[in-house]
Amino acid sequence: MPEQLQKLVIDNGSYTIKAGFNTGDDDGNDTSTPIKVTNAISKTKDGIIHVGNQYLSHTNNFSGIQFRRPFEQNNLTSWETEKPIWDYTLDNLLLQTNDQSQSTSSSSSSSLQKHKRGKVIDPDDIHLILTEQPYQLPQLSTNTDQIIFEEYGFNKYYRCIAPSLVPFSVDTNQINDDFVLVIDSGFNSTWIVPMIYQQIHWPAVKKLPIGGNLLNGLLREMISFRHYDISEDPILINTIKESTCFISSSNYQQDLQHKHDLMCEFVLPDFKLTITGFVKNENSMSSQKLPNDTQVLKLYDERFTVPETYFHPEIIFDNNRTTASSSLLNNAPFKNLTDLIVESIMACPSITQPLLSANICLSGGSTNIPNFKTRLIGELRKELPSNWKVNIFDKQYDINRDELSWYGGINLSNESELLQEISISKKDYFEHGANWCQQQFGFKNV
């Protein structure tokens, strides 16, 4: 008998939460789409606290905004911060009008006792699929389990790492979903996760501690030192990165020698003409009418030096006055993204190695940097055997790369029998205790 519970998928990323219900019907029609919520509590200069996306309606206060995130060192460490964000997310999921979607709930149960498509939702009617970071500390995972069952009271629950859901969202006409090497680069770090028959091969999982957050920090230091002090404008820094940065497609040193040819101008926000800033373009109408006092930022090698850290991590220390002169760091053998991918493939069973190199899938928002795929293919072909195919797939049914795990969760929720086998019910949790989830979901037992 098919499960009657509603399926809710929450991809709990350290930068944004992707959440949504499986709205598919028995005829195979699926209109499921996630909502995206900033996974942070923010404070503007006027002292007002905003939860999730609330700060977006106060664009005049973007300058000097401060973000507090529940993640530290890739681990979900603060449910005191996370829970209000979840309540806000659930309100936005379950409320229909704009006025309702802006409110935050004072308690988890009140967040869930709302209406969705005219139906009353109860936490006991929800089967939750939740993602977490790889190798999260067991006690922190246990804290999450307690929140799920004891605070919210969901009926059933499956917890997994986000990259493990990617094979469920790939285009099987392009990729052999039995052997997928997932490169998941997000806000805090980059993970290399080999999936063999939809199972994680844990001995080969690798981590590169470089992600969007580090790139933002490096860009902030370079611009503040060379041009203007933008250290208190995290939104501006992120906008500049997403608008101007790219990875050298083949030769970083050559681009460095011709950096003046790659210069671009970024118009800084004046909160009159622009709130977030934009790239100055001769064909842009806004650029032709710039006031005389407009501040324009000229960017040269900053555009490609910052994301080059994926392939030359030593750049991080070269641009720091304290560490640049350290002989220990200068002689340290830093491993880049290519090195870790090769190590991951070689740590898998030999028969699967060429299959994994031929089925590489990019996920995570940081892989959207221009030329990421092109450069990575070129670097891998230099390191892997010449008779191996190296294929990287980044377009899966026109799904955004940062949404691949969420859509994978939706597809997994359609596999009712499989989901039943790997999930834990609220009844099981209270019968066996808090450690039961860790025994079922923990990486040591997979």
UniProtKB/Swiss-Prot annotation:
SMART domains: ACTIN
GO BP field: chromatin organization
Keyword Zinc-finger assigned: no
Domain of life: Eukaryota
Region entry Disordered, spans: 99-118
The entry's keywords: Activator, Chromatin regulator, Cytoplasm, Cytoskeleton, Nucleus, Transcription, Transcription regulation
Major place of residence: cytoplasm
Family note: Belongs to the actin family. ARP6 subfamily.
Described function: Component of the SWR1 complex which mediates the ATP-dependent exchange of histone H2A for the H2A variant HZT1 leading to transcriptional regulation of selected genes by chromatin remodeling. Involved in chromosome stability.
Name of the protein described by the UniProt record: Actin-like protein ARP6
Organism per entry: Candida albicans (strain SC5314 / ATCC MYA-2876) (Yeast)
